Amino acid sequence: MNIPFAFWLVPVASVIALSMAFIFFRQMMSADEGTPRMREIAGHVRHGAMAYLRQQYKVVTYVFIALALIFALMAYVLKVQNPWVPFAFLTGGFFSGLAGFFGMKTATYASARTANAARKSLDGGLRIAFRSGAVMGLTVVGLGLLDIAGWFLVLSFVYQGENMALITITTTMLTFGMGASTQALFARVGGGIYTKAADVGADIVGKVEADIPEDDPRNPATIADNVGDNVGDVAGMGADLYESYCGSILSTAALGATAFALNGDMQMRAVIAPMLIAAVGVFLSIFGIYLVRTKEGATMKDLLRSLSIGTNISALFIAGATFAILYLLGIENWLGLSFSVVTGLVAGVIIGQATEYYTSHSYKPTQRISEAGLTGSATVIIKGVGTGMLSTCIPVVTIGVAIMLSYMFANGFDLTMSAESISHGLYGIGIAAVGMLSTLGITLATDAYGPIADNAGGNAEMSQLGEEVRHRTDALDALGNTTAATGKGFAIGSAALTALALLASYVEEIKIAMIRAIEDGREFIHPLTQQVFDPASATMPDFMEFFQVNLMNPKVLVGVFIGAMAAFLFCGMTMEAVGRAAQKMVEEVRRQFREIAGILEGKATPDYGSCVEISTRAAQHEMLVPSLLAIAIPIIVGIVLGVAGVLGLLVGGLAGGFTLAVFMANAGGAWDNAKKMVEEGNFGGKGSFAHKATIVGDTVGDPFKDTSGPSLNILIKLMSMVSIVMAGLTVAFA
């Protein structure tokens, strides 16, 4: 198998991304960490974060060993799976966990340095926080491309000269996405439960009952709250987007192998095209990172503009570069496919802007929630829920338009629904997802920046650095809240396109599983013609007809209902988990205020360790059931309802999960920034009736935006990945 010379750009981009991440890490570490008090607080947070991560990885390791043994049984005993799957699964989980580890290590070292830099200037604080966030962004894309390039080279050597080699290679590579998805779900759910248990506990007792400021060192839950920002928003988000990034590239490669199956040379070009777009995106992300800077006294809009310059210029350049890449590759309909990529990029920008509109206190929706605080917490909750529901409209319509346009651009606006037209159109949807995620190096940097700035503000408050420094860190923190909300919108949008591409890839995996079953002596009879069905020559419409995938089939309808229900079931379980953990935290903080004399007067030091322990134990205990449920549902549906039921499940999960995720993320973000707006002196300012009402809204919104909402991105992708990996089992036993 001849691998084109252009492919080598992928491992080169991977090495450069990891090298630049290391350079940014060294630059951050060379900055001064500040006063002894600042170092001490940063040390507490770092110790708590790393202790949690070690504990989480220990639990996840047991799950991975169990799943790898099941996959080995399926591959080597039952013979219903490719023998490389157990190994691919493990590497996907390993690299995802590694990205989270490096990101969190960087974030915990960066917070005190950001606060210290903010003592001198706003720009100094912004640069350290943003470049530290870039370590996470570049580590994710670097490790993702390294994993993809490594597996592609190994499998190309193993399967060279075989019939359907590229289809086998790409569908096998897809399975390492399940490893990444599983690790991501544990990171998101566990981290989300940890951070929100601490946050809710700190807010209810500290702000509402004891009337002390946020991040006050007298609050026993403060350190746990700061640790939680790292485990939830850095390690969790990194693992989530690592999975989307790899999933979009691999599913598009698999769809390309199918779309151009009759033209070997063109097939190879279609397979490496998404990898090359992602590789060029690395270079342009690095360029964009260097463009981010600001001036002293910058307003919120100035800060947003400085970040937007970096991300938007990177996106603009990757759009232009895509035309050149696909033209030089000589790929069929290169112009249409380039416009599909642009469609994905534009969709990402629109979803980001819509999220900013509904969650930033620079705009009316959040301002109205702040104003509702004047009449109490009930109206704040009602307004927030309404805002979250309204905010689903633009992202859903945007994704719908992006799906249609990318599909039609890629198949040359062929509306005949022929097999070739469908396969080319689906490839276009996949490559649109790659386009949306191609500048992940910088978009994830803006997201990881948020918790670093938040921790810097906490460090400044606990170290009592003075009003001017706190004002600067507050400005950076407010920007971080908006970038985090925008990043969540971006993550949800990319998850929807990736899940749709994975849905199409599932049919290809079923095809491979059926061919394997035929080689073992099994025969498939078409239910309508009663003739022997040959999957090797079958097209996408043929499979839909064979498995009777239509709305009149009750198996499909039942699958759709189960998929939609799964999203709500998952959210309910994670919300309840946060509620239970937060109750324990509230009781512990109240106990310390009651029993340790002198805490509120600042004469005694709270027991921070007990609160960290409560969050850690709760996260480990509560994350297992919802995470394992996400793995179990597709397997059970596959065996009971077959392929038609699984396709219904994935469609229902995608539609229900996407809409619910947007609602929860945006409602939570709006409540958070409504509280921030009041704290800036509006509607009575800190300590006022409106402030206490918006704190209640923010507390309700915390698990919305940081636990349940973001976890849904991974749920919809993980269900697709599990279905793909278990395709052989579904074909054999359904």
Q: Which residues fall in each region the model found?
A:
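Hydrophobic packing and interface segments
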Residues: 1-734
